[in-house]
Every structure is written in C-alpha cells, then in structure tokens.
Amino acid sequence: MQTSPLLTQLMEALRCLPGVGPKSAQRMAFTLLQRDRSGGMRLAQALTRAMSEIGHCADCRTFTEQDVCNICSNPRRQENGQICVVESPADIYAIEQTGQFSGRYFVLMGHLSPLDGIGPDDIGLDRLEQRLASEKISELILATNPTVEGEATANYIAELCAEAGVEASRIAHGVPVGGELEMVDGTTLSHSLAGRHKIIF
C-alpha cells in the first residue's frame, strides 16, 4: 500500500513502546495527526528534552536531570539510614505512592541473570558494595521482584550486607489484600505461610 514515508516512520517509531503493535501504532499516529497536532508537538518536545537531559543519579542510579536526585539530596532521608534496593526506577514510584518509606534507594536497573550474561557489576553491585563500606547504613531493604532472578539477586546482596556488617531485610510477599486463597498460586501461598506472624492483642 502506498502511504506517506513520514507516516510510516512515525508508526514504526511508536511501536518501540511496550504493548504497542502495528494497529495501536497506526491508531495513535492517525489520532495525533487528525485530532491533536498540538498534543503531538508537546509529546515530541517532551520526548526530545527527556532523552537529551535525563540521566542517572550519581548516588542511587534513578532517572533525574540533576547530578543527585531530590530523594538522595534530602537531609531527612539521609538521616534515616535506610536504603531500599529496587530493580527499576518505576519501583521507586510504586513505593513512594504508599507513603510508608522515608529512606533512600538504590536502583539495580535489572537483576542477576547468569544465563543472559548479567553479572553483579552489570547491575551496579560494585557501587552498592562501596556504599555499604563507606556510608552509615542502618538497614538495607531488599525490594527486588519475587521472581527466581529477583530472589537470587536479593540473596547475593544479603551476603554482601553480612560481609559489611549491615542489617538486611526482605520485603514481605504473599496473599494480596482482598484476594481469595483458592485463586492464589502455590508458590505465593507457600511464601505467605512461611512469612506468617503472630497476632498480639
């Protein structure tokens, strides 16, 4: 089919987004061109600025346009002494929305995966080890995903903490609030039973 080369290029570019296939990309492209050209221009400008100006925090490795992000430079968070280790910057947003954590973070940008050739240095564990040795950390909270790779990564970091004399803890995981036991998979239910706690009145 004969079509505009620029339109084809736009649709192909939109397909780099997760979950966007040919049809979705086509719909987005036509919507921007037909109904919202000003929105398309804002999107293009925001993307251009973000791609050129956003880098990584020198301390925690999350996304920021500053050398050190607002969380790491916050004196109250520095005094807290807790560092929460996560796999991606998106995990920080999820935890921050709970309002339950007032410490700092360290972003791995992935997890250990020997089969894919991803080792400790590839996810910044050499830098984390330096922080364990040089900073006064009261607790390292391991909030990696509850996958095989996430658990292996958490165990590896826990060993680093033991060597550095820093307390390490793992976030709890199990039956979701509002969930029904019969709908929960066996592995999750096993974790819930193993991580049970006493009810004190």
Curated annotation (Swiss-Prot):
Tagged with keyword Metal-binding: yes
Lineage: superkingdom: Bacteria
Database matches in SUPFAM superfamilies: Recombination protein RecR
Database matches in Pfam families: RecR_C, RecR_HhH, RecR_ZnF, Toprim_4
Entry keyword annotation includes DNA damage: yes
Alphabetized CDD domains for the sequence: TOPRIM_recR
SMART domains: TOPRIM
GO biological process per UniProt: double-strand break repair; recombinational repair
Protein keywords: DNA damage, DNA recombination, DNA repair, Metal-binding, Zinc, Zinc-finger
Signal peptide: none
Gene3D superfamilies reported for this sequence: 3.40.1360.10, 6.10.250.240, RecR Domain 1
GO molecular function terms noted in the UniProt entry: DNA binding; zinc ion binding
ZnF (C4-type) intervals: 57-72
Ranges of residues in domain Toprim: 81-176
InterPro entries per record: DNA_Rcmb_RecR, Rcmb_RecR, Rcmb_RecR_Znf, TOPRIM_dom, TOPRIM_RecR
Family that this chain belongs to: Belongs to the RecR family.
Alphabetized NCBIfam families for the sequence: recR
Function statement: May play a role in DNA repair. It seems to be involved in an RecBC-independent recombinational process of DNA repair. It may act with RecF and RecO.
Protein name: Recombination protein RecR
Originating species: Salmonella typhimurium (strain LT2 / SGSC1412 / ATCC 700720)
Name of the encoding gene: recR
